[in-house]
Every structure is written in structure tokens, then in C-alpha cells.
Amino acid sequence: MANTVSAKKMTRKIAKRTAINRSRRSRMRTFIRKVEEAIASGDAATALTALRSAEPEIMRASQKGIVHKNTASRKVSRLTARVNALQA
């Protein structure tokens, strides 16, 4: 348990930041899941629309430090490849 005033404040800050990060990570995963569900259903138009909305969310998560930049790029790249394969 935190004893000093500064340690107590840091505990509060960490809890607040954790909640924000959890929300951002969940939002990113939701957008990714929408793309994957559209791909699984075989609907190319819906998948493309979902991908266009998911890409900025994934990159925003990387800018906020939720995921690494390369991880975000890899996720976008793989989703894009799957959507393109669906259209072909």
C-alpha cells in the first residue's frame, strides 16, 4: 500500500491511465473483429468498409502507445491482404 502522498497520487494516476488504455485497446480490437467477421461472412463490400474504419483506429492506438508501430502496421497489412483476396 502506498504510504507517501506522491505514491498515493501515482497510484491514482496509474489506475486512470490503465482504464484509458484498456478502453483504447478494446476499441481497437472491436474494429479488428468487425473486419474479421465481414471477411468470414464473405462480404467484400462490408469488409472493405470495415477495414477503412479500422485502419485509422489501429494506427491511432499505435500513436497512443497501446501497440507498437510495427505491430499496428502488420495488423493493417494482414487485414488488407485478406480483404483484397476476398475481392479477387
From Swiss-Prot:
Domain of life: Bacteria
Membrane-crossing segments per the record: none
GO function term, MF aspect, one: structural constituent of ribosome
SUPFAM superfamilies xref list: Ribosomal protein S20
Keywords: Ribonucleoprotein, Ribosomal protein, RNA-binding, rRNA-binding
Keyword Ribonucleoprotein carried by entry: yes
Record GO cellular component, one term: cytosol
A biological process from GO: translation
Family under the similarity heading: Belongs to the bacterial ribosomal protein bS20 family.
Stated role: Binds directly to 16S ribosomal RNA.
Protein name per Swiss-Prot or TrEMBL: Small ribosomal subunit protein bS20
Organism of provenance: Methylobacterium sp. (strain 4-46)
